Amino acid sequence: MNDPSCSSADETAHPGRLVIISGPSGAGKSTVVKQLMKRCDVPLQLSVSATTREPRPGEIHGQDYFFLSHEEFERRRKLNDFVECKQVFSMGQWYGTLKDQVATGLNAGKWVILEIDVQGAMAVLDDPHYRPVTIFVHPGSMEELERRLRNRGTESESSLTARLETAAAEMQCLSRYQYEIINESVDNAVTEICQILLDQRKTTPCSKN
């Protein structure tokens, strides 16, 4: 799936780009993104999200997450400091992408990657200020997704059911994305996404919304 409406242009006209990579839990997108950062010959920068949850052992503020108090997060949310944010009700915590994180990367000529869920991606697409490259990663079928989630061995039946229901709803938004990647092999998925980004360096920013 791609968007033919983007026109050719000199990449120096827009050196920084926003890239959204989404996909259901269990699709392997985090692994793909980590490998993409290492292997792709594009100046990538992974956006660091903000959260109200407590740091886990070994996590570093500003590197893994920006750890904010609930009060600070709410203050910044009211100031419209987030590109997108949401509360994960099952955890009682907030997560979001700070505008200054994105702006700093774009102004430095980086291709800023947002590894965010569909809800966050739709919020970005609805903001005319951003015209991101949008990529949806999934395992090819709901059956394969269920198999991968079960193989993790970390999900209760109720949690598994909830994740699959969320994934089914997220798949309904696939048409809002410019590119679809079926992650049957991490190496192949990384190669496909890297080629997409290399091709996009020759086009003007566009979005499919």
Swiss-Prot record:
Q: Where in the cell is it found?
A: Cytoplasm
Q: Which reaction does it catalyse?
A: GMP + ATP = GDP + ADP
UniProt keyword Kinase present: yes
Q: Name one GO molecular function term.
A: guanylate kinase activity
Domain annotation Guanylate kinase-like: ranges: 16-198
Q: Does the keyword Secreted apply?
A: no
Query: Which top-rank group of organisms is this from?
Result: Bacteria
Which EC numbers characterise this protein's activity in its record? 2.7.4.8
The signal peptide stretch is: none
UniProt keywords, alphabetically: ATP-binding, Cytoplasm, Kinase, Nucleotide-binding, Transferase
SUPFAM superfamilies (alphabetical): P-loop containing nucleoside triphosphate hydrolases
- InterPro entries from the entry? GK/Ca_channel_bsu (IPR008145), Guanylate_kin-like_dom (IPR008144), Guanylate_kinase (IPR017665), Guanylate_kinase_CS (IPR020590), P-loop_NTPase (IPR027417)
Gene Ontology CC annotations of this record: cytosol
Top-level EC class as recorded in UniProt:
transferase
- PROSITE patterns from the xrefs? GUANYLATE_KINASE_1, GUANYLATE_KINASE_2
| Chain residues that bind ATP | G23, P24, S25, G26, A27, G28, K29, S30
- HAMAP family per record: Guanylate_kinase
Q: Which family does it belong to?
A: Belongs to the guanylate kinase family.
Job of this protein: Essential for recycling GMP and indirectly, cGMP.
User: What name does UniProt use for this protein?
Assistant: Guanylate kinase
Give the gene symbol.
gmk
